[in-house]
């Protein structure tokens, strides 16, 4: 779960603490944002996180490996209009990899070239816009964001990624709304790094992606491991993401407080 306070101790600052666990992932994060760091609305934020992911523990076939990530960063947001802002960030992240029971050949080849432990420093620049009528459970308006992130000199690996996310809420009646959403991404290595780190690959599938499919179960398939040549190809991800969908949103029957729950057909 997570705890978020938008007016921490009456200061106007936002503090969030998240602790989530699943069968294959543990995620701990902390963030602090001063939304009015300057009088003209420039925001300043800090964050720290620890994430442990072990795909070996999933009950269905995905590429077998685990990665422990520890990092933190600082970001500055600058408003350019009432509905949009620019964001700039710097972060540091340490990743430690472990191979699993049936690690596929693509992973073993990357580890042979680059090793298992990496420390990377990243810079990011982004633009975001929102005209949503509310922050949660919106029923009209749109939001979108575009972010470019790249490792910088001093990093063990060299790669970048460009991500776009957008959604539109189109009311049909007072109770029924169509939601159109899409996520686009492109990532690539550069310089001395010969290929994109496999753990930076894009996947699809799952509740927040392509519903009806298991988490991270969609995407390019791997080469079977040499230790198990009869193994069927497993989802390995790729450096390009194109996904989208349409949902029909309407109030959940027999629920009095409609501000926290609603039904979605997809």
Question: How would you name each of these model-derived features?
Answer:
Residues 1, 101-266:
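C-terminal outer-membrane beta-barrel translocator/porin domains of Gram-negative envelope proteins
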Residues 1-145, 178, 208-212, 216-227:
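Gram-negative/organellar outer-membrane beta-barrel architecture
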């Amino acid at each position: 779960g997570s705890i978020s306070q938008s007016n921490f101790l009456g200061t106007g600052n936002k503090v969030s603490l998240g602790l989530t666990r699943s069968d294959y992932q543990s995620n701990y994060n902390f963030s602090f944002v001063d939304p009015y760091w300057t009088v003209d609305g420039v925001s300043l934020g800090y964050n720290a996180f620890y994430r442990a992911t072990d795909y070996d523990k999933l009950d269905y076939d995905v590429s077998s490996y685990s990665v422990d990530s520890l990092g933190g960063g600082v970001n500055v947001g600058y408003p350019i209009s009432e509905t949009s802002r620019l964001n700039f960030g710097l972060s540091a992240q340490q990743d430690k990899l472990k191979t699993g029971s049936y690690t596929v050949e693509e992973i073993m080849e990357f580890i042979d070239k680059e090793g298992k432990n990496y420390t990377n420093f990243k810079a990011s620049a982004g633009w975001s816009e929102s005209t949503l009528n509310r922050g949660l459970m919106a029923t009209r308006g749109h939001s979108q964001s575009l972010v470019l992130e790249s490792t910088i000199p001093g990093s063990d690996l060299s790669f970048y990624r460009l991500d776009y996310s957008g959604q539109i809420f189109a009311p049909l009646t007072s109770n029924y709304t169509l939601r159109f959403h899409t996520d686009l991404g492109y990532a690539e290595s550069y310089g001395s790094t010969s290929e994109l780190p496999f753990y930076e690959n894009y996947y699809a599938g799952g509740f927040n992606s392509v519903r009806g499919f298991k988490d991270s179960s969609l995407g390019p398939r791997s080469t079977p491991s040499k230790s198990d040549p009869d193994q069927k190809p497993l989802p390995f991800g790729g450096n390009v993401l194109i996904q989208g969908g349409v949902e029909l949103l309407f109030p959940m029957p027999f629920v009095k407080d409609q501000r926290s729950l609603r039904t979605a057909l997809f």
